[in-house]
Design a protein with these regions (language model features):
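Charged helix-capping and loop-helix junction motifs
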Residues: 1-4
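Conserved alpha/beta-hydrolase catalytic His-Asp/Glu region
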Residues: 9-67
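Short beta-strand/loop motif that positions the catalytic acidic residue
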Residues: 68, 74-76, 80
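Hydrophobic "lid"/C-terminal helical patch
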Residues: 20, 53, 91, 118, ...
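Catalytic active-site module of serine/aspartate enzymes centered on a nucleophile-bearing elbow/loop
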Residues: 97-132
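Solvent-exposed polar/charged
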Residues: 66, 93-94
Length: 132
């Protein structure tokens, strides 16, 4: 988190956005999508990084997982370097009833990296929910 704060303090929006996107994508997506996500990431401010870092390090919501009664879907990108496999495994363990889809060839933004596969995974989840 400190490294991200230091980077954000010295980089302009476009440079910071490009850096962040370069670290979260599989590298096999349309340049226009990369530019869009870089623009979104470029809007991140230092306070947002601090709050997100605090939440990641100190906020443990796992004690609430067994209270969830609604259908749950967990979508993970096989090449995601942001959400580590052990974090995804812990979430799946805490929600054994959850539908899980591991999406091949994508990183942290599967909805952009391979929208067709992501949408198919959502449809499969919704079909399973509707089938009861």
């Amino acid at each position: 988190v400190l490294e991200r704060i230091q980077q954000r303090e010295v980089m302009d929006d476009a440079s910071y956005g490009a850096l962040r996107v370069g670290k979260m994508l599989s590298g096999r997506i349309d340049p226009q999508i990369v530019a869009f996500l870089a623009a979104v990431a470029g809007e991140i401010r230092v306070e947002g990084i601090r709050c997100g870092g605090f939440a990641m390090h100190y906020l443990d919501t796992s004690v609430f997982l067994d209270k969830i009664t609604a259908p749950v879907a967990i979508f993970t990108g096989a090449d995601d370097i942001v959400v580590k496999p052990d974090a995804a495994a812990a979430l799946k363990a805490g929600l054994p009833q959850a539908h899980h889809a591991l999406l091949a060839g994508v990183g942290h933004a599967p909805y952009c990296e391979d929208a067709a596969s992501f949408n198919a995974a959502i449809e499969a989840f919704l079909d399973a929910v509707l089938a009861g």
